Amino acid sequence: MNVFGKKEEKQEKVYSLQNGFPYSHHPYASQYSRPDGPILLQDFHLLENIASFDRERVPERVVHAKGGGCRLEFELTDSLSDITYAAPYQNVGYKCPGLVRFSTVGGESGTPDTARDPRGVSFKFYTEWGNHDWVFNNTPVFFLRDAIKFPVFIHSQKRDPQSHLNQFQDTTIYWDYLTLNPESIHQITYMFGDRGTPASWASMNAYSGHSFIMVNKEGKDTYVQFHVLSDTGFETLTGDKAAELSGSHPDYNQTKLFTQLQNGEKPKFNCYVQTMTPEQATKFRYSVNDLTKIWPHKEFPLRKFGTITLTENVDNYFQEIEQVAFSPTNTCIPGIKPSNDSVLQARLFSYPDTQRHRLGANYQQLPVNRPRNLGCPYSKGDSQYTAEQCPFKAVNFQRDGPMSYYNFGPEPNYISSLPNQTLKFKNEDNDEVSDKFKGIVLDEVTEVSVRKQEQDQIRNEHIVDAKINQYYYVYGISPLDFEQPRALYEKVYNDEQKKLFVHNVVCHACKIKDPKVKKRVTQYFGLLNEDLGKVIAEGLGVPWEPVDLEGYAKTWSIASAN
């Protein structure tokens, strides 16, 4: 099956200029004023090549710079129509093509892909109704739950601003941030086990981490979290093996996936949701909006709904992997809403914004990002996924700007009443299409709409009962933040895994230059398990001085919540 519609090229390939005309000289020849003389400014072939070379690089991703990916096919195996009216989740057997990108988080594009770091796992599905993205990680939790902390957290994971050394040489700022923000302990407990060094991209899982809200045709809300689980199970490397590969084979994971697909293997993942009703959310021990917590499977079991099959390598890495742009805004299609998770709320802005910086204002017009119902090139040719299958042609009023090469032709850039230019309105939760959009809106129509929205908000706002319309607020630390990571360390990890965990932490934290930070690392883990803190102190060669959470906060706090 040829998902992306590649055609065999039958025409001769002729070396040409950028204008398409053949170049009649040797590609390595330059115009000189005389043999062994200076070159001429009129040599536009040379100038064109040098100018193009000078502009080959685009800004690398500020996070998730190191990565690779491939094409895929999604299939819906079980309908979710009872909890969402989102079109791709309705009919069993529905299939669509897509693309996936795997990555590390903190490192630059040249760093090893086996480094101890979360893995980004982002999917783009080319549905008939538009592009649908999942922007996930291979860990079900994250380091923080306050969106404002994300930029400074990433700063701490990158190079020291004075020495310009990264965490392979100096881990001081890495641990300084983490130990001053103890909500990170769950992610760290997960990541410094062997789960932090997956054996391959095809043998690791992916999680939304965030809670989303699915809405069904009756308007009922259901909180969901997505899980994408490898069909082969979760396979890991030891920390020592991952470190060895970082030096001997820094592109290990990329090589492995490329070779698997080249050899005809088609790794598969199974897709699940956990569901939580609003009533369950009000009784849940933790906030449904807390990115540092998981939902226990006993209370909220996995419900399968689909499969993802990795199908083939891309034709050009830059065009399809470097230029692909994911965003959680594309997760929130009709039938799926964002939760009040502040990190998710910030990502809704940050992801499209960074793509505009990295790729330009019209990044969504690039072939790899263009929806099928906007004439996506990947849906042409002999592909079974054609633009003609789309139920409607997508139109909006966004126009012009740099590199705009799909500018909607003669379509009006406003709500028009001219012949053959009337926009249709499609009800998001059914197949109704009407002429609802008009240039004139009566005040009474607006009032009816506002009342309906207020009623929906009252019915669906289950978690946050705001008394004022703004709070300056920092999530505080409490004993609850240590319950789940403590269970992970004490009950899930066996004795051998606990030894490896200590080994991994000590090998990483021993590169801390500041003795105060090194001491704090031992107390940080001591809050999780006192014996763990003590053995890490022994490994780091620092005195063991246990403190409770209140003492830890008093010793290391730098400011009040406001």
Curated annotation (Swiss-Prot):
Iron among keywords: yes
Chief site of localization: cytoplasm
One of the GO BP terms on file: response to hydrogen peroxide
GO molecular function: catalase activity; heme binding; metal ion binding
Matches recorded under InterPro entries: Catalase, Catalase_AS, Catalase_clade1/3, Catalase_core, Catalase_haem_BS, Catalase_immune_responsive, Catalase_sf
Active site: 64, 137
Reported cofactor(s): heme
Gene Ontology CC, one term: peroxisome
One Pfam family matching this protein: Catalase
Residues forming coiled coils: none
Binding site for heme: 351
Keywords for this protein: Cytoplasm, Heme, Hydrogen peroxide, Iron, Metal-binding, Oxidoreductase, Peroxidase
Keyword Oxidoreductase: yes
Family: Belongs to the catalase family.
Subunit (UniProt): Homotetramer.
Record function comment: Occurs in almost all aerobically respiring organisms and serves to protect cells from the toxic effects of hydrogen peroxide.
Protein name per its UniProtKB record: Catalase T
Gene field: CTT1
